[in-house]
Amino acid sequence: MREVISIHVGQGGIQVGNACWELFCLEHGIQPDGQMPSDKTIGGGDDAFNTFFSETGAGKHVPRAVFLDLEPTVIDEVRTGTYRQLFHPEQLISGKEDAANNFARGHYTIGKEIVDLCLDRIRKLADNCTGLQGFLVFNSVGGGTGSGLGSLLLERLSVDYGKKSKLGFTIYPSPQVSTAVVEPYNSILSTHSLLEHTDVAVMLDNEAIYDICRRNLDIERPTYTNLNRLIAQVISSLTASLRFDGALNVDITEFQTNLVPYPRIHFMLSSYAPIISAEKAYHEQLSVAEITNSAFEPANMMAKCDPRHGKYMACSMMYRGDVVPKDVNASIATIKTKRTIQFVDWCPTGFKVGINYQPSTVVPGGDLAKVMRAVCMISNSTAIAEVFSRLDHKFDLMYAKRAFVHWYVGEGMEEGEFSEAREDLAALEKDYEEVGIETAEGEGEEEGY
């Protein structure tokens, strides 16, 4: 089996995690107590869903997941929520005092007390796997726990499981909406380690997803639950081929191979289509061509940046439901003829396609319509550099005055780490710029890169 372990760090990661496991359980027909009426074989079994769930002798299905937070309130909601019986109590790890939006507390002072316990629990899950494929790490980098403890954990995972892939689903601060004053500091310090210790990072941004909820689902005031359910659909589509059987299945490592041209350039943009409310879906056809086009709409991107300002390096389309390769090829051919969607000249093919026959499931009482076919696109575009340059600019404004820096230094960080992380991001922006430059005829070969 090719198992995957999910790690949810901090409030953002845990709440996205709740939405994901709720959806996975619905997709596989697993009840909130872990029983699965449709699964007749007790014990192991070679079913595809065993990549995400392990099965006990009593026939109970337990998610291969760990939830970590430095303070108890959010995890207590999981402990008392609908799915409290789904998780093993040891999978829910919470500390006593939180990171207070401070990267240094999450990474140095408070995080380091809890990180060994986390790694122990992860080791137990890993020992329970026959062929561990990699980790999915969910966190947000605006706060203290997600950024600090999240990056500490990734660093330690690199040491313990060097060869395993790590995919990050990371919530980045939004351009307009802010939840903490020190977001730019936390996210830049955290990205500094994401650069080195994740293989693929999918960037999500609340503001972009708010706008999608308002525009496509007509929700006037979207809540985090609305956002998280949308993110869960994306993650479900990405992992569908690990959990169900399909025509063109995609492994975690395949993402990496197809999406990452250079190790540092691994920050992905995602979109999902059709995001449509039940009232509208009734009147629309939503052919493969239509959903493919809307996946490329700048307005449907889950991070605030405009792909028209950049070039695509690679792009992975995960279709699910009633989709045949012929339609996919036709609609991708149409996309390639469009002038608005530009690929870099050194990557002529650029498309990776996965097809899974299991249609997407929706949460009962949720906002999304049940549709016959859906697509999730993960693309590597130079436009994502906009997200970094925005953050860098905010970081510079604060750091020029050394505002709030004493909180970090007081927790044992050195000021040099700020400038080191900032320089690393400046280099990253430069990398993105260089990747998008046209290669002149004949000189591209000699330059060796």
Swiss-Prot record:
It is found in: Cytoplasm, Cytoskeleton. It catalyses: GTP + H2O = GDP + phosphate + H(+). Undergoes a tyrosination/detyrosination cycle, the cyclic removal and re-addition of a C-terminal tyrosine residue by the enzymes tubulin tyrosine carboxypeptidase (TTCP) and tubulin tyrosine ligase (TTL), respectively. Acetylation of alpha chains at Lys-40 stabilizes microtubules and affects affinity and processivity of microtubule motors. This modification has a role in multiple cellular functions, ranging from cell motility, cell cycle progression or cell differentiation to intracellular trafficking and signaling. Mg(2+) binds at residue 71. It is an enzyme of class 3 (hydrolase). GO terms for biological process: microtubule-based process. The keyword Calcium does not apply. The modification N6-acetyllysine is found at residue 40. GO terms for molecular function: GTP binding; hydrolase activity; metal ion binding; structural constituent of cytoskeleton. The keyword Acetylation applies. CDD domains: alpha_tubulin. PROSITE patterns: TUBULIN. The record marks 449 as: Involved in polymerization. Its EC number is 3.6.5.-. One of its GO terms (cellular component) is cytoplasm. Belongs to the tubulin family. Dimer of alpha and beta chains. A typical microtubule is a hollow water-filled tube with an outer diameter of 25 nm and an inner diameter of 15 nM. Alpha-beta heterodimers associate head-to-tail to form protofilaments running lengthwise along the microtubule wall with the beta-tubulin subunit facing the microtubule plus end conferring a structural polarity. Microtubules usually have 13 protofilaments but different protofilament numbers can be found in some organisms and specialized cells. Tubulin is the major constituent of microtubules, a cylinder consisting of laterally associated linear protofilaments composed of alpha- and beta-tubulin heterodimers. Microtubules grow by the addition of GTP-tubulin dimers to the microtubule end, where a stabilizing cap forms. Below the cap, tubulin dimers are in GDP-bound state, owing to GTPase activity of alpha-tubulin. This is Tubulin alpha chain. It comes from Tetrahymena pyriformis.
